[in-house]
């Protein structure tokens, strides 16, 4: 972990922005150690350009670093957003921004949101210039996919003051989006017209909802005016979600499924690695790996005892570096070695494994030897592209913590 932290600090030295603050509070500029970037330009949101011209929000990169280094106080202080309450963070840039007097219309493509996800927190982050005047604004939010029918999500009033510190303004839109998640509609194929959703939204008792746009103010998909104070690069919706327990892990976007469906995977490079074959979820894949050497303990027949050894996974070597932003490599560890007969508590055997070792001692031809396997695993937080969006997700059972015999 110390090595990973050091790598992250070097990687983020020139591309970081301050920690987020609670909605309706002006952000304080708090760059990471070694940062030399003044974050007051919308263009900085693009991050470093990849050779395939991909972009990622710097906010997502810092959120990833905060989680890995344990500096997650910014989220822990927010209501209902303890670190353990979410396992996925999805960032969505606005697809379109339009303006009609003091009414702003923001459109997002939420097709990447899984039906099995439960919304924990939704933040609308808007980058405003220092010269932005103070006046009341009504913001209408829509889901729009490929310029097709528009799904009205909700509206709220905002009065963003002139900012003297960070130009970022953060709004908590969780209550506005919760009905959309609870409907459990297939957003890839089912769309409601803006007028229908607006009429339904206006009747909600939620204080964060305001009256729906009137007939003369309804969203016009052909409207071309762009707000003076923002553009799509400076408007981002950040969704903190958790897979519902009722989903029973069916359809959960595992790393294997994400890799198989990613358009950024280097198939040609991966095909050159010998011996690659597919496994079930939660099992390590047989990729090109670098194994470190650890001093061995020996038993009577000369074989080392069951122990944990290094297994460095380098995503560049397996053709995954194009879609995985961080980490570029990590130590997954693995288990190898012999299990003594009979077993003892040092190797954390189950009762069944212990009895199996006893039978093996007295009847060696009857059963096979216990196997050296992982008995404790830990998750790995990963920042990567899922389709055209950037996702921060905690993948379970990615690192071997302890080995034992079973």
UniProtKB/Swiss-Prot annotation:
Induction info: By dorsal mesoderm-inducing signals including smad2-smad4, activin and other nodal-related proteins including nodal2/nr-2 and nodal4/nr-4. Shows autoinduction by nodal/nr-1. Induced by vegt, acting in an autoregulatory loop. Beta-catenin potentiates the response to activin. Not induced by wnt8 alone, but wnt8 potentiates the response to activin. Suppressed by ventral inducers such as bmp4.
Database matches in InterPro entries: Cystine-knot_cytokine, TGF-b_C, TGF-b_propeptide, TGF-beta-rel, TGFb_CS
Principal place of residence: secreted
Keywords assigned: Cleavage on pair of basic residues, Cytokine, Developmental protein, Disulfide bond, Glycoprotein, Growth factor, Secreted, Signal
PROSITE patterns xrefs: TGF_BETA_1, TGF_BETA_2
Coiled coil: none
SS bond partners: 306-372, 335-403, 339-405
One Gene Ontology term of the molecular function aspect: cytokine activity
GO cellular component, one term: extracellular space
Protein name from the UniProt record: Nodal homolog
Organism (species): Xenopus laevis (African clawed frog)
Phylogenetic lineage: Eukaryota, Metazoa, Chordata, Craniata, Vertebrata
